Amino acid sequence: MSFVLRHLGNNLWSGRLDLFPGDALVHGFSARQGGVSAPPYDTLNMALHVEDDPAAVWENRRRYCAALGLSAERICTPRQVHGTEIVRVFRRDAGRGARDYADCIDDADA
């Protein structure tokens, strides 16, 4: 397994694992550059569970997803409990946690 880091433009970077064949799963790991959040969350904070401005978090998510060719409205986010649980998501899960932390998938990290 290898990790590839690529520049998406506008100071946005994304990492990708070659673990999945072709386009079987769109995924990425974001860096902290290229967003709009103010300190101490600067700049590309995408976490709704901290005290960052939710509008800034939404704009950061929108920018990152747009750079990947995705709709931020359809992303599905876990609560990220720093455990080992990975969940399978389905089309019906599209948008869970995209704008509202209370709607995230419970007790999972990915």
Predicted regions and their residues:
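Active-site microenvironment for binding and transforming phosphate-containing groups
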Residues: M1-A110
